[in-house]
């Protein structure tokens, strides 16, 4: 099995990258892909850049050049579920765009034209992630992760997301684009991220302060998840 791992920022990939054995680097169109083995698993780790376009382009390059069997999206997210605190884990059941609106043509809010309303994460990967959470004794919430090209900082944008997606557990800027690409390629995916902020008026300050905490937690999750996947 080969696992593709995608993080947007340097801080979100550096801990994993530094542990890759026999590491080689491939740079294409501003995307950096690191290949080798991690915990005995063949991996291709992508630093995509921030936002939906960067994530979609990077995921496509990763799938075309490295042919991973599964995709794991890692990194940080803003918490929406009331029980989530900084460092907690979110696992996707599904992902949706929170900033897509073609409702004039009969689509659901958040649904891109010609696409499903949601992109479903793989059940086997979800189960492996939940097993990993139990093993590490982490607090986690499983559910809908929503994505858009905005860092959510303030009550107006937050209220809009809560109104349109009351079931959403977390918000970030890449996961749905990655799920969209994986859907088109027929490659299973899951989002496993750690909370860096709670998407409120002070979220930009919390993000800057706690990004390292989120990166450490999400990287630990991915490492342990790879071990679980390698066991089959």
UniProtKB/Swiss-Prot annotation:
Q: A Gene Ontology MF term for this entry?
A: methylthioadenosine nucleosidase activity
Q: What class of enzyme is it?
A: hydrolase
Classification via Gene3D superfamilies: Nucleoside phosphorylase domain
The record's keywords, sorted A to Z, are: Amino-acid biosynthesis, Hydrolase, Methionine biosynthesis
Residues annotated as the enzyme's active site:
12 (proton acceptor), 197 (proton donor)
- What's an example GO BP annotation here? purine deoxyribonucleoside catabolic process
Q: What is its EC number?
A: 3.2.2.9
Function, please?
Catalyzes the irreversible cleavage of the glycosidic bond in both 5'-methylthioadenosine (MTA) and S-adenosylhomocysteine (SAH/AdoHcy) to adenine and the corresponding thioribose, 5'-methylthioribose and S-ribosylhomocysteine, respectively. Also cleaves 5'-deoxyadenosine, a toxic by-product of radical S-adenosylmethionine (SAM) enzymes, into 5-deoxyribose and adenine. Thus, is required for in vivo function of the radical SAM enzymes biotin synthase and lipoic acid synthase, that are inhibited by 5'-deoxyadenosine accumulation.
Protein name listed in UniProt: 5'-methylthioadenosine/S-adenosylhomocysteine nucleosidase
